[in-house]
Amino acid sequence: QPKSDPLVTLFLPSLKNLQANKVTLVCLVSEFYPGTLVVDWKVDGVPVTQGVETTQPSKQTNNKYMVSSYLTLISDQWMPHSRYSCRVTHEGNTVEKSVSPAECS
């Protein structure tokens, strides 16, 4: 099976989430092969490890893989003007998706 680069999508927390005490950003990584990769999170370019949870790769129906990575912050840590980044390293290649929540409101 040929190598397949990951497709990375970064989801912001919903308003419903923001009213709770926790905020979760989701980085969905799909369509990759082989099934090993590394997901890193950064806030304003600074690596973050606390509050990060990444699932084990699961096989899709097309024999490629997908993982989800979650960054959970307490509301006090949530800064709409910050830049949140999800970086995926797969087979020596890096894909990074960034979002600034202030741009979305």
Swiss-Prot record:
Cystine pairs: 27-86
A matching Pfam family: C1-set
Domain (Ig-like C1-type): residue spans on this chain: 6-100
SUPFAM superfamilies: Immunoglobulin
Region (C region) location: 1-105
UniProt keyword annotation of Endoplasmic reticulum present: yes
Cellular localisation: Endoplasmic reticulum; Secreted
UniProt keyword Nuclease present: no
Gene3D superfamilies: Immunoglobulins
Keywords: Disulfide bond, Endoplasmic reticulum, Immunoglobulin domain, Secreted
InterPro entries on file: Ig-like_dom (IPR007110), Ig-like_dom_sf (IPR036179), Ig-like_fold (IPR013783), Ig/MHC_CS (IPR003006), Ig_C1-set (IPR003597), MHC/Immunoglobulin (IPR050160)
A cellular-component GO term for this protein: endoplasmic reticulum
Subunit structure: Associates non-covalently with VPREB1A. Interacts with SYNV1/HRD1 (via N-terminus); this interaction leads to increased IGLL1 ubiquitination and degradation in pre-B cells, possibly through a lysosomal, not proteasomal, pathway.
Functional description taken from the UniProt entry: Critical for B-cell development.
Identification of the protein by name: Immunoglobulin lambda-like polypeptide 1
Gene designation per UniProt: Igll1
